[in-house]
């Protein structure tokens, strides 16, 4: 049974999220602040951790910083709408994804499943020492569009040879958008690509992900302008010049 650590000072969130995850067969360990969680997470690493950012005694960012000194387990942050700067810092520290409050329990569960699948694939690849010849399916998972390169098997993305750190959802959105270079994708299609099941997300959710994608690419290339807005429709990954 896979274990998930949940750290939040809101006991209602601890209870509701624990119930949702336990229904899916996960074991859940809960903590009410970062200070009480740090020793337990290092001594008994779970398969995945979910942190709130703003907590008493030790916030989620400091907890992640200390955890990363000992462990590389996947981490999802629960954030407020005004914590965009914290998100960028969290990604640099090694967070895997962010979910904005208030959130759907079903959405959170699907994010957890997606990240654990990715982690399992990464561990399997590491176990082989990277020496196995890629299968046809694995080769098909490698996408190249101009200066963009994405490896779905390893969940890596580069632009002009420079790595770009993406969350699971951002990766899936871009991996759906890039093959349609020059044509564009409707928001509904991007939602379907990013979420495994019929999880409700509104247009603004996709818009927020696109905004973060643009910012991340601009960190490695200040002139990046390849993700274009198609007003009233969706987005387009521009064709390489």
Curated annotation (Swiss-Prot):
Q: Which residues form a coiled coil?
A: none
The entry's Mg(2+)-binding residues are 8-9, 52
Subcellular localization? Cytoplasm
Cofactor(s) needed for function:
Mg(2+)
Gene label: chvI
Q: From the Swiss-Prot or TrEMBL record, give the protein name.
A: Transcriptional regulatory protein ChvI
The record's Gene Ontology biological-process terms are: regulation of DNA-templated transcription
Cell inner membrane listed as a keyword = no
Q: Which InterPro entries match?
A: CheY-like_superfamily (IPR011006), OmpR/PhoB-type_DNA-bd (IPR001867), Sig_transdc_resp-reg_C-effctor (IPR016032), Sig_transdc_resp-reg_receiver (IPR001789), WalR-like (IPR039420), WH-like_DNA-bd_sf (IPR036388)
Which residue ranges does the record assign to the Response regulatory domain?
A: 3-116
A GO molecular function assigned to this protein is: transcription cis-regulatory region binding
4-aspartylphosphate is found on 52
Extract the SUPFAM superfamilies matched here.
C-terminal effector domain of the bipartite response regulators (SSF46894), CheY-like (SSF52172)
- What does the cofactor section's free text say about binding? Binds 1 Mg(2+) ion per subunit.
The feature table lists the DNA-binding region at 140-239
- What's the domain of life for this entry? Bacteria
Summarize the PTM comment. Answer: Phosphorylated by ChvG.
Source organism per UniProt: Rhizobium radiobacter (Agrobacterium tumefaciens)
PANTHER family from the UniProt entry = DNA-BINDING DUAL MASTER TRANSCRIPTIONAL REGULATOR RPAA (PTHR48111:SF21), REGULATOR OF RPOS (PTHR48111)
């Amino acid at each position: 049974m896979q274990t998930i650590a949940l750290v939040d000072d809101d006991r209602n969130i601890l209870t509701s999220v624990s119930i949702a995850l336990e229904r899916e067969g996960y074991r859940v360990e809960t903590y009410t602040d970062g200070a009480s969680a740090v020793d337990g997470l290092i001594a008994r690493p779970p398969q995945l951790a979910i942190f709130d950012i703003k907590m008493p005694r030790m916030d989620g960012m400091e907890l992640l910083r200390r955890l990363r000194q000992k462990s590389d387990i996947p981490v999802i942050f629960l954030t407020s709408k005004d914590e965009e700067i914290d998100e960028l810092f969290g990604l640099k520290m090694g967070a895997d994804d962010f979910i904005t409050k208030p959130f759907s329990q079903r959405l959170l569960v699907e994010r957890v499943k997606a990240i654990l699948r990715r982690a399992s694939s990464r561990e399997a690849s590491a176990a082989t020492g990277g020496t196995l010849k890629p299968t046809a399916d694995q080769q098909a998972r490698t996408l190249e569009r101009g200066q963009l390169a994405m490896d779905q098997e390893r969940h890596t993305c580069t632009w002009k040879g420079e790595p770009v750190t993406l969350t699971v959802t951002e990766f899936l959105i871009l991996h759906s958008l890039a093959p349609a270079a020059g044509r564009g994708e409707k928001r509904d299609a991007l939602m379907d690509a990013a979420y495994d099941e019929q999880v409700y997300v509104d247009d603004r959710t996709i818009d927020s992900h696109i905004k973060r994608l643009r910012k991340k690419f601009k960190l490695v290339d200040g002139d990046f302008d390849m993700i274009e807005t198609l007003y009233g429709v969706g987005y387009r990954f521009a064709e390489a010049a």
